Curated annotation (Swiss-Prot):
Stated name of the protein: UPF0303 protein ACP_1015
Gene3D superfamilies hit by this protein: Haem-degrading domain (3.30.450.150)
InterPro entries xref list: PduO/GlcC-like, PduO/GlcC-like_sf, YBR137W-like
Database matches in HAMAP family: UPF0303 (MF_00761)
Organism: Acidobacterium capsulatum (strain ATCC 51196 / DSM 11244 / BCRC 80197 / JCM 7670 / NBRC 15755 / NCIMB 13165 / 161)
Amino acid sequence: MSLAEDIALVARQESALVFEHFDENTAWQLGSRLRQMAVERGYPLVIDVRRFGQVLFTAALPGAVPDQAEWVRRKTNVVARFHRSSYAIGLELAEKQSSLEEKQGLPTVDFATHGGCFPIRVKSAGIIGCVTVSGLPQRADHELVVEAICALTGLDYATYKLPQA
């Protein structure tokens, strides 16, 4: 799978994974779904669901370390700024052999273009927040979020799943 193909597939995920509505209860369902998936699979994750400016769900699972919360913050900053998944931004920069620091002057201490943060898009409202996980390799972080959003929105994950790298 080429970078260009991955970029196109992630863009397809971003445009298709849309919630009809999103409130505190939806955030709880999404965060709880991610937590359940992580527990069942033995993943040591930090999970964060937020509207921009307001945390709605957060959890740290056994084996997670404090640095993962810092990764959540840095990935969230990317999605809040660009309204794209952190993985999409990272893939596009990799294709151009560049970085956010080089292209935008954004410091890596505050911005991480690694997979795992995905915009929360609501029909008729646009992007209102993001969901982030940290603790797995970046592609796996990204895919776990996509799988959970598919489950909540009734979409078939197999249709949107990225192929194994």
